[in-house]
Amino acid sequence: MPKLLLILLCTVLLFTSCSTRKDDAPISLTVIEENQASDASYTDDIIFLGESTTYHLKSRGVLPEGKDTKQVWAPKSGTLMLDPTVKDCMIVYPETGEEISLSDALTRKNPKMLCLTFGLNGATSFIARGDSYFKYCYQDLVDLIKEKSPNTKIIINSCFPIANKMDMSRYTITAEVLNSYIDTLNIWACSIAEKNGLIFIDTASTLKDKDGYLMTEYSADDGYHLTAEAYRVILKAINDTLQNKEN
């Protein structure tokens, strides 16, 4: 991402009132069909860790090896929530299929790059608790990665927007307000990246329509999971950013 956009993202001030979601459990995994893989080369070296929208990189088959990709780390549920326990989570280790701790996976794999994407799960709680809680949870995870795999290049990816059609019946806020919360969380995530000298990539802006919602063509039926085309756009944005940093 161009440096100017990074600066603009991190300096935008968003003021939103705190609301409470009726059910703040992680958004569930849904089955998505396989599609054509992306040919982005830099992303071939990345391990992806995050929520169900990250797991769907595998479900959509957009990474090399399609649904058999070993580039996505996730628990059996297919989703994680960024909280104080995330660093102690168990994942299904793709190389063996066994369930091991994230710490063990980092030590075994020593990934060249690890891309983190968090924010939608628990978004309203993060806003209600304030930036210190969100940053604490993210920093804890970053510290674990640095400790267990010090040579890994850590990428913090922005959380993705939701579509206007998303069912908001479990929330006490509108889709527009939830997107404003996501924007705020992305600013906080950017600040974590800056503090630690990490790469922050604003993929969210590549998915938004003129009103800030997830574009229709990038939205699955539920309004928050993504289409294969959306993932190709995301992977291209990541690839382009990494390529620009190499040049």
For the regions a protein language model found, what residue spans apply to each?
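Positively charged n-region of N-terminal signal peptides that target proteins for export
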Residues: 1-7
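C-terminal motif of bacterial Sec signal peptides marking the signal peptidase cleavage site
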Residues: 14-17
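N-terminal, intrinsically disordered, polar/charged segments of Gram-positive cell-envelope systems
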Residues: 20-47, 58-59
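Conserved SGNH/GDSL esterase-like catalytic core that processes O-acyl groups on lipids
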Residues: 40-136
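Second-shell loop/turn segments in exported
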Residues: 89-93, 104, 122-132, 142-145, ...
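Generic structural signal for well-ordered alpha-helices
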Residues: 138-143, 186
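A short helix->loop->beta-strand "cap" motif at the edges of active sites that frequently abuts
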Residues: 149-153
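Catalytic His-Asp segment of secreted/periplasmic serine-dependent ester chemistry enzymes
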Residues: 162-247
